[in-house]
Curated annotation (Swiss-Prot):
Disulfide bonds: none annotated. Its main location: plastid. It is found in: Plastid, Chloroplast. GO terms for molecular function: rRNA binding; structural constituent of ribosome. It comes from the Eukaryota. Part of the 30S ribosomal subunit. The keyword Plastid applies. One of the primary rRNA binding proteins, it binds directly to 16S rRNA where it nucleates assembly of the head domain of the 30S subunit. This is Small ribosomal subunit protein uS7cz/uS7cy. Keywords: Chloroplast, Plastid, Ribonucleoprotein, Ribosomal protein, RNA-binding, rRNA-binding. It comes from Lemna minor (Common duckweed). GO terms for cellular component: chloroplast; small ribosomal subunit. Belongs to the universal ribosomal protein uS7 family. The keyword Lipid metabolism does not apply.
Length: 155
């Protein structure tokens, strides 16, 4: 029997301006080389651009975009008897949000445009509308999981 206690789950803190955990998760994922103030600048500029484009609450657009991109199911490689199978697994809400944020940032980095704030705002607006690269990535993942449903018993 182990003497070590169970580790506490860390909860995501909220950002200083909007008091929103999703914004802070975005900031931590966009962060490069420890430049958190630059990451905050990029996110806040993107939020302002969303406000200008949609003329609605930018945080609701952000929530809607992340909800639209969050996958329910994904595939994981599993080696069984010398061959590797793509096994579909269900994803929890926290892991799903993390994946969605990663996909949104990757899609916005690929976009052509002036700066990261502009590209991120465009990607978030598109994702909220149900289009864009991040949504395509989610649908692709769901198709992969559906195609490999036969291997679901390998979990």
């Amino acid at each position: 029997m182990s003497r070590r206690g169970t580790a506490e789950k860390k909860t995501a803190k909220s950002d200083p301006i909007y008091r929103n955990r999703l914004v802070n998760m975005l900031v931590n994922r966009i962060l490069k080389h420890g430049k958190k103030s630059l990451a905050y600048q990029i996110i806040y500029r993107a939020v302002k651009k969303i406000q200008q484009k949609t003329e609605t609450n930018p945080l609701s657009v952000l929530r809607q975009a992340i909800r639209g991109v969050t996958p329910d199911i994904a595939v994981k490689s599993r080696r069984v008897g010398g061959s590797t199978h793509q096994v579909p697994i269900e994803i929890g809400s926290t892991q799903g949000k993390a994946l969605a944020i990663r996909w949104l940032l990757a899609a916005s980095r690929k976009r052509p445009g002036r700066n990261m704030a502009f590209k991120l705002s465009s990607e978030l607006v598109d994702a909220a509308k149900g289009s864009g690269d991040a949504i395509r990535k989610k649908e692709e993942t769901h198709k992969m999981a559906e195609a490999n449903r036969a291997f679901a018993h390998f979990r």
